[in-house]
């Protein structure tokens, strides 16, 4: 189980990312369209003034139940440990064991 403060920190980052998403996208689009170097620098300065945690690259996908940051399956939002436990208990509909 991950520390609660880490999970809260990740939630805070998600909120910041959602808040600044349109601003960051529009700024990046402007940078691509503008040809003047001085204007690009000005837009880049504006982009850098946004909070560091608002960047989408700082987000980490975590397990929904345990908060584990690694080995998390996107389709389920669960880590491999919990996924296997749920699979063995028959809680995942449509999941079957492979045999070849």
Curated annotation (Swiss-Prot):
Keyword annotations of the record: Chloroplast, Plastid, Ribonucleoprotein, Ribosomal protein, RNA-binding, rRNA-binding
Span of the signal peptide: none
GO molecular function: rRNA binding; structural constituent of ribosome
Superkingdom as given in the UniProt entry: Eukaryota
Protein name: Small ribosomal subunit protein uS14c
Subcellular location, record wording: Plastid, Chloroplast
Pfam family, one: Ribosomal_S14
InterPro entries for the chain: Ribosomal_uS14, Ribosomal_uS14_bac/plastid
Native source species: Pelargonium hortorum (Common geranium)
Family note: Belongs to the universal ribosomal protein uS14 family.
Role played: Binds 16S rRNA, required for the assembly of 30S particles.
Gene3D superfamilies, per database record: 1.10.287.1480
Record carries keyword Iron: no
GO BP terms in the entry: translation
Assembly and oligomerization: Part of the 30S ribosomal subunit.
Major localization class: plastid
